[in-house]
């Protein structure tokens, strides 16, 4: 679920979100909230407060589009993120520029040492997939594997996927 800066700065976010979760019998551990680096700059203290409370309830946080915003590593490491989603622009630039590729290698190493799960977005072909695996990403996302699906199509999509695996 994508979160905006105004949602994350809402003093009532925890209570409102937990009411929705509880009324729909959803386990908080199944919820993933995505936010971009820029979403953290409205009211940083309130954003961190909300993230910590939600994280304690079991909700996980993904930092989306890493590498395209302000990339303040001190703030990122000080926030309760579980997963860092590297933006596709880093992937594309890495394949054409060895300096960018080296930076991605170092970043993945540092984030892994800190216990983050790493995901890369925008993988569209085998070269990009191989590169992402070689760099140590835990998850790969992109059109090579699946295109975004309307909710109404998800059951059919997963049924086909299950048949293909069986």
Residue ranges of predicted features:
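EAL-family c-di-GMP phosphodiesterase catalytic domain
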Residues: 4-11, 30-44, 57-166
């Amino acid at each position: 679920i994508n979160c905006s800066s105004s949602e994350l700065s809402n003093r009532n976010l925890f209570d409102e979100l937990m009411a929705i979760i509880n009324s729909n019998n959803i386990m908080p551990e199944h919820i993933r909230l995505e936010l971009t680096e820029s979403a953290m700059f409205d009211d940083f203290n309130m954003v961190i407060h909300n993230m910590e409370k939600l994280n304690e309830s079991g909700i996980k946080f993904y930092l989306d589009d890493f590498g395209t915003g302000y990339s303040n590593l001190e703030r990122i490491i000080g926030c309760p993120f579980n997963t860092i989603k590297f933006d596709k622009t880093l992937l594309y630039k890495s394949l054409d520029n060895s300096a960018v590729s080296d930076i991605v290698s170092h970043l993945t190493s540092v984030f892994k040492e800190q216990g983050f799960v790493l995901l890369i977005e925008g993988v569209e072909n085998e070269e990009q997939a191989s590169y992402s695996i070689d760099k140590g990403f835990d998850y790969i996302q992109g059109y090579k594997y699946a295109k975004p699906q309307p909710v109404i199509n998800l059951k059919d999509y997963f049924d086909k996927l299950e048949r293909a695996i069986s």
